[in-house]
C-alpha cells in the first residue's frame, strides 16, 4: 500500500516488491479490487455522512462568526479560517465516495488534480490554524496584557493568510503529480524512483503537517497549564475551577486532534518499513483511518464552538432554540484591543504584573 493523502485510495504496487523501495519499473499503482457486499456500500455512505456532518457544523460556525459583530474576536478569526478549511476539506468527500462506489475515477484528470491539491491545502491549513490558535491561547493566558499589540484582528488575518499561502506551497507536489492512473483511480504519479519519492512525500507531510504542529500545540498548552496552576495556588477555589476547565480543554483539543490523525500517519509510516499485506483487511484499515482523519473536521465545531458559551448561545439563536440577541461579548479571555488599552491605562503599574497571572481563563 502506498502512503497517500486521504483524498486518494489505498494502492498496491503492481510490479515486483523491489519497486516499493525505488527499484523496478514505474508501473501504475492501482486501487484494491472492489469488495462485494457491505463494504462497497458502507464506505461511501460513511464518507457522505461525515461530509454532511462536517459541512453542517462548520457552515454554522462560519455563519455565526460573520453574522454577529461581537463574535469577531481574534480567536474567532482563527476559528473562522479553520471552519472554512474544514468546509473545503469536506467538499472532497463526495468525489472520494464516488470513486470508492464506482471503483474508478469518473471525473477526469483536471478534477483529479484539483481535488487532491485542495485536499492537501485544506489539510495543512486546518493543522496550521489549530497551531496558530494554540499559540494565540498561550499569549492570551500567559501574557494577556503584554501580548495585546500582537493579538489584534489585523494580525490574526495576516497570520491566517500566511497559513493558507504556506499550505498551498506545501501542496505543490500534489498539484504537479496528481493524475488519473491506468487503473482508473485518482492518485499521485511519482517519477522515478517511485518508492523514494513516495517515502519522502509521506515523511515530509507527516513531519511538517502533523508531528511538528502537534509538538507546538502540546508545548503551548503545557505552558498554559503551568501558568494556570501557578495562578491557582494564589486565587483559591474560583481559580481552581478555571484551572480544571483549561485542563479539560487541553485534553480535548490535543487528544481529539492526535487521535483522529495519528492512526493515518502511523499506517503510512509503518507501510514504509513493512509493506502491508494485499488483502481486504489492509484496505479496511486504510478506509477506517481515512474516515477518522476526516471526522476530525466534524469534531472541530464541537471543540471550538459548543465548549464556548458565546458560540453555544449564537448557535441556539440561529437555530431558533432560544430567544435572545445572539452572542454576548467576547470570551473573558478574549478582550478586544480597545478594552485592553483601557485596562492598561486604568490599571496601576504595580498591579499589571499580577493581572498577567490572574486573568480569567475559564472560557477558551
Swiss-Prot record:
Q: Which InterPro entries match?
A: GPCR_Rhodpsn (IPR000276), GPCR_Rhodpsn_7TM (IPR017452), Somatstn_rcpt (IPR000586), Somatstn_rcpt_5 (IPR001184)
Intracellular or extracellular location(s): Cell membrane
SUPFAM superfamilies per the record?
A: Family A G protein-coupled receptor-like
This protein's GO cellular component annotations are: neuron projection; plasma membrane
Q: Which GO terms describe its molecular function?
A: neuropeptide binding; somatostatin receptor activity
Which intervals carry biased composition (Basic and acidic residues)? 327-342
Q: Does the keyword Mitochondrion apply?
A: no
One of the GO biological process terms: G protein-coupled receptor signaling pathway
Lipidated positions per record (S-palmitoyl cysteine) = 320
| PTM summary | Palmitoylated by ZDHHC5, but not ZDHHC3, nor ZDHHC8. Palmitoylation creates an additional intracellular loop which is thought to be important for efficient coupling to G-proteins and may target the protein to lipid rafts.
Where's it mainly located?
Answer: membrane
Q: Which UniProt keywords apply?
A: Cell membrane, Disulfide bond, G-protein coupled receptor, Glycoprotein, Lipoprotein, Membrane, Palmitate, Phosphoprotein, Receptor, Transducer, Transmembrane, Transmembrane helix
Q: How does it sit in the membrane?
A: Multi-pass membrane protein
Give ranges for the Cytoplasmic compartment: 67-76, 136-157, 223-247, 309-364
Tissue localization of expression is: Adult pituitary gland, heart, small intestine, adrenal gland, cerebellum and fetal hypothalamus. No expression in fetal or adult kidney, liver, pancreas, uterus, spleen, lung, thyroid or ovary.
- Record's subunit section: Heterodimer with SSTR2. Heterodimerization with SSTR2 increases cell growth inhibition activity of SSTR2.
Q: What is this protein called?
A: Somatostatin receptor type 5
Q: Which organism is it from?
A: Homo sapiens
Q: What is the lineage of its organism?
A: Eukaryota, Metazoa, Chordata, Craniata, Vertebrata
Query: What gene is this protein translated from?
Result: SSTR5
Amino acid at each position: 500500500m502506498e502512503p497517500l493523502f486521504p483524498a486518494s485510495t489505498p494502492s498496491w504496487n503492481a510490479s515486483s516488491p523491489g519497486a516499493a523501495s525505488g527499484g523496478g519499473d514505474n508501473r501504475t499503482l492501482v486501487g484494491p479490487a472492489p469488495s462485494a457486499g457491505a463494504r462497497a456500500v458502507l464506505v461511501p455512505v460513511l464518507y457522505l455522512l461525515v461530509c454532511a456532518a462536517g459541512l453542517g457544523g462548520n457552515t454554522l460556525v462560519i455563519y455565526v462568526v460573520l453574522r454577529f459583530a461581537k463574535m469577531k474576536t481574534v480567536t474567532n478569526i482563527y476559528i473562522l479560517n479553520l471552519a472554512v478549511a474544514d468546509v473545503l476539506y469536506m467538499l472532497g468527500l463526495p468525489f472520494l465516495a464516488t470513486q470508492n462506489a464506482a471503483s474508478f475515477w469518473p471525473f477526469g484528470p483536471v478534477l483529479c488534480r484539483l481535488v487532491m491539491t485542495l485536499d492537501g491545502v485544506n489539510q495543512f491549513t486546518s493543522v496550521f490554524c489549530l497551531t496558530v490558535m494554540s499559540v494565540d491561547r498561550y499569549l492570551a493566558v500567559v501574557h494577556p496584557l503584554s501580548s495585546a499589540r500582537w493579538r489584534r484582528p489585523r494580525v490574526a488575518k495576516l497570520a491566517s493568510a500566511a497559513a493558507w499561502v504556506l499550505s498551498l506551497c506545501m501542496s505543490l507536489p500534489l498539484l504537479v503529480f496528481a493524475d488519473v492512473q491506468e487503473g482508473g483511480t485518482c492518485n499521485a504519479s511519482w517519477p522515478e524512483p517511485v518508492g523514494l519519492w513516495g517515502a519522502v512525500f509521506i515523511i515530509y507531510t507527516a513531519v511538517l503537517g502533523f508531528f511538528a504542529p502537534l509538538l507546538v500545540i502540546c508545548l503551548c498548552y503545557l505552558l498554559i497549564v503551568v501558568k494556570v496552576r501557578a495562578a491557582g495556588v494564589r486565587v483559591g477555589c474560583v481559580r481552581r475551577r478555571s484551572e480544571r476547565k483549561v485542563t479539560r480543554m487541553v485534553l480535548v483539543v490535543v487528544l481529539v486532534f492526535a487521535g483522529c490523525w495519528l492512526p493515518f500517519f502511523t499506517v503510512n509510516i509503518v507501510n514504509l518499513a513493512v509493506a502491508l499485506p494485499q488483502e481486504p483487511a489492509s484496505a479496511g484499515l486504510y478506509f477506517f483511518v481515512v474516515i477518522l482523519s476526516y471526522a476530525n473536521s466534524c469534531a472541530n465545531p464541537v471543540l471550538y464552538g459548543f465548549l464556548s458559551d458565546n458560540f453555544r448561545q449564537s448557535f441556539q439563536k440561529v437555530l431558533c432554540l432560544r430567544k435572545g440577541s445572539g452572542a454576548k461579548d467576547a470570551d473573558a479571555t478574549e478582550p478586544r484591543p480597545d478594552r485592553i488599552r483601557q485596562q492598561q491605562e486604568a490599571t496601576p503599574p504595580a498591579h499589571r504584573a499580577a493581572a498577567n497571572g490572574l486573568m480569567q481563563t475559564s472560557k477558551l
